[in-house]
Amino acid sequence: MVQVNGNYLKLKAGYLFPEIGRRVKAFSSANPDAALIRLGIGDVTEPLPLACREAMKTAIDAMGTAEGFHGYGPEQGYGWLREAIAKNDFQARGCDISAEEIFVSDGSKCDSSNILDILGEGNKVAVTDPVYPVYVDSNVMAGRTGEAGEIGRYAGLTYLPISADNGFAALIPSEPVDLIYLCFPNNPTGAVATREQLQAWVNYARANGALILFDAAYEAFIQDPELPRSIFEIEGARDCAIEFRSFSKNAGFTGTRCAFTVVPKGLKGKAANGEAVELWGLWNRRQSTKFNGVSYIIQRGAEAVYSEAGQAEVKALVSFYMENAAIIRRELTAAGLTVYGGEHAPYVWIKTPEGMDSWGFFDHLLNKANVVGTPGSGFGAAGECYFRLSAFNSRANVDEAMARIKAL
């Protein structure tokens, strides 16, 4: 009989969001008339920007002609999209990033997991707690951890707790680590990092030969122009960081699928014999072997994000969701709850009421208010007694959800 990958057997009972789905399904089966409002999974709800839709329609029509047909595209992405990304997202903010260092993909979740393909199994990994579960689970699947302990933490990982007590800013590790996952604006807490905080991480990484895996999927939601949107705004980051970005949340591409990863040329790791190896070449080889590229039609839609009309429409989308976040913050505060986040991110991080843990609060809101959120403990042990609500929904649903919660 064929053997399975035993690392998958280390995974806890279920990925957070499928477990939420299971509980919601059971509730809906027992209460078929309940009008659920879902503020849990961070999926967007508003239509794709018109500029993106029109660009994709034009691309579809072109595909119907001999002259405009496109088959397999470059695994790294079409040059015109990579140029637009480099110019608008990085060079415009003073970052020394070229188009050749941009790798277009179908999702930052995929990239933040697949990057492990080019990194050695012996690397010591650090993650914040709470943390986006994919960072942890992908390392478990790749064999970089031991078993999970009683509170769900895996042996072999270095956990960096973040909470209200430390301003949701993880302390620099006291011991050397090799891989550091950072996400700002943060999922799930909604916290942001200052230039000084990111500079400290870059300094640590350079001093210890570590690699920062920087998830900037929510950078478009930052409201303060003085806050950094990219790790590459920080001096020295080209020597120690890879950045993941996505069109999912700013432009509504969750169902359309387009993202990108930035791997600077000159960024190096070491081989088993100690020889320095450029990570750009390894990632390029990995993508060329395991990835067929994002469709031409979708990439034309992503390119339109950088048009004048696209920029205006994306800005309006982001503003809409941030207004939702402001409503959630205001109404929950008025209801007597302690809330964080929601100012530079589409997530509001809530302290659960006294005597109620994360899943208890989940069940309370589900059963009493018919509102679905995300238990903080699902993001890690330090997320216990916290709860995440997402601003990704219609205004009517957000208003109704807040009215229901305030009525409890």
Swiss-Prot record:
Residues engaged in binding substrate: Y15, G42, K109, Y132, N187, N292, R388
One of the GO BP terms on file: lysine biosynthetic process via diaminopimelate, diaminopimelate-aminotransferase pathway
GO MF, one annotated term: L,L-diaminopimelate aminotransferase activity
Signal peptide: none
Transferase keyword on record: yes
Subunit structure comment from the entry: Homodimer.
Name of the protein: LL-diaminopimelate aminotransferase
